[in-house]
Amino acid sequence: LFRSDLSLVLDQSVTLQAIQRVAEQTEKAILKNVSVFDVYVGKNLGEGKKSYSVSFILQDENQTLTDKVIDATMDRLITRFEKELNAIIRK
């Protein structure tokens, strides 16, 4: 079981359900849970923007997850969030 967190800056119209849908479509095999642990709205994000801090739980039922697999999974998720939800990843 592995947890990885991302902070995504999104338009205020983007819902948690949209984040979950994109994540599940991207990583059905090893993604076990997607949950938001913080929502932030502030002037420094820009007009009409909000930041979701999202936790992803990854687990492979058949083998131990390697750093390489985890990194590739998170890269795919980030790419999909950027393309489909116009997300900006907060560092």
Regions found by a protein language model. Name each.
Residues 2-91:
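A carboxyl-terminal module marker
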